[in-house]
Swiss-Prot record:
Recorded family membership: Belongs to the glycosyl hydrolase 2 family.
Entry function: Displays beta-glucuronidase activity with the artificial substrate p-nitrophenyl-beta-D-glucuronide (PNPG) and with 4-methylumbelliferyl-glucuronide. Is likely capable of scavenging glucuronate from a range of chemically distinct xenobiotic and endobiotic glucuronides present in the gastrointestinal (GI) tract, to be able to utilize these diverse sources of carbon. As part of the GI microbiome, this enzyme is able to reactivate glucuronide drug conjugates, such reactivated compounds can significantly damage the GI tract.
Binding site for D-glucuronate: D163, N412, N466, Y472, E504, W549, K568
Chain location of the short sequence motif N-K motif per the record: 566-568
Protein encoded by which gene: uidA
Name this protein carries in UniProt: Beta-glucuronidase
Phylogenetic lineage: Bacteria, Pseudomonadati, Pseudomonadota, Gammaproteobacteria, Enterobacterales
EC identifiers of the protein: 3.2.1.31
Domain notes: The N-K motif seems to be a discriminant that could be employed as a fingerprint to identify beta-glucuronidases from the large GH2 family of proteins.
Subunit structure: Homotetramer.
Amino acid sequence: MLRPVETPTREIKKLDGLWAFSLDRENCGIDQRWWESALQESRAIAVPGSFNDQFADADIRNYAGNVWYQREVFIPKGWAGQRIVLRFDAVTHYGKVWVNNQEVMEHQGGYTPFEADVTPYVIAGKSVRITVCVNNELNWQTIPPGMVITDENGKKKQSYFHDFFNYAGIHRSVMLYTTPNTWVDDITVVTHVAQDCNHASVDWQVVANGDVSVELRDADQQVVATGQGTSGTLQVVNPHLWQPGEGYLYELCVTAKSQTECDIYPLRVGIRSVAVKGEQFLINHKPFYFTGFGRHEDADLRGKGFDNVLMVHDHALMDWIGANSYRTSHYPYAEEMLDWADEHGIVVIDETAAVGFNLSLGIGFEAGNKPKELYSEEAVNGETQQAHLQAIKELIARDKNHPSVVMWSIANEPDTRPQGAREYFAPLAEATRKLDPTRPITCVNVMFCDAHTDTISDLFDVLCLNRYYGWYVQSGDLETAEKVLEKELLAWQEKLHQPIIITEYGVDTLAGLHSMYTDMWSEEYQCAWLDMYHRVFDRVSAVVGEQVWNFADFATSQGILRVGGNKKGIFTRDRKPKSAAFLLQKRWTGMNFGEKPQQGGKQ
């Protein structure tokens, strides 16, 4: 799915700003056809943004069910005769949309875009009413899963099995955009780089309802190569490669023409190669070592609402600390984030929202509502698998052309020990490879699924591990934790002979808490714990990356294990550094960029 851009043939009207907002406490909005008139008892709400924290009302913050958004929109007079499309970049977790009284689309899945051609339902030079019913409920057949229960007071309550707050609403931009009636509908680009990096090729495939031509232009807008037709290959001599740390981008200018119209779409292209060879992860045929974070789209007041200021500041902090990569834990991030990564040479592991496929973590289950078996008709079943496949399809369709995206992660921390795990994940791994044969794939492994009990890791190209020795187990005992961690990593290395990326490692740390004795929760313990992990990483040859959990403290559901959210951040939720930020900055900026440190750290 192409991201809307303004060109000589296309225009965009952003609908971000204040909308009318109403809770549907009685779940009567559909029956009463709320889209047919102005919302009653509404209040103003900011879009984009989660609805949960915009008001001083705990009932709204923890609300489960339907909410409604509405606003009047003027259609520019100059849009007459154009194709007009309404697009939502993300509605969490389900959205149904009306233009005036006409239902135009619905979408399940909270982190990927959806759109509809609304040309038949609008008139240029007049206003229309746009109404959206948003539902934030999760069940075992949604991605991510959850359960809706009713408490003793008859109030619905959303439980979920992932450790971050279930923010909901219209989280990203809403827009109208135009195209001519002859238009470019989709583009797929795949780049190949010769072993000596002195030659590259760019394969293109275009979906359009007109005659197609393409021009590849360099960053100075000089034409490098041209082609005709809906598919083909362009040759590039002495290409300027997209590299980690240097986001050089070409532009593939695609034109679709009919006898009376033409459409122009410029797609930014990074020429680079990605491959796994033995225990190495290769970018442009060179071994690459990941440094960085698992992150969250999470901020005070905004929740998961996209914010440009936060994006700029977070990337400034990542640049300062020496991070060269991150994972979109645990859902696809805003497209603006990937554009930034493309431009700045940041390497991204792109993940679906499949998190919480686990009965063993103790998250989200009330007494008596825990299924007996994870992979079963009452929990993760065939319908779940189809929803999961759809999430993979939408992720790849949106992000396939981003050079920063070097690997797909199809799930985070599923329990892969029980019967049924391999039967569930094997078809999804196969489907992901068919959808994109050009990138490695992974499924992030949870701590208790070790080399002896896991049943699926051989289905993937890279082993991504989340490990917390010295925190959840061997608590406070760094000497024992170091031995156990190294023993497990060596067991995986011997079993799979794959690259290993530690996609999560971290400890909860209260900013300002200090200890002469390196006690847990103190800033001193966070530093000592990270130092220990780094010694192990440097000794295990298959480890090709370290992504700390987490970049910043983030909101979670209430519970006795979480005091004001998850505190594993290297930065606080308002982006103040803890002591460990300076430890990481010294380690990561002291490395040769993208290269693994020399082995050392003898015990």
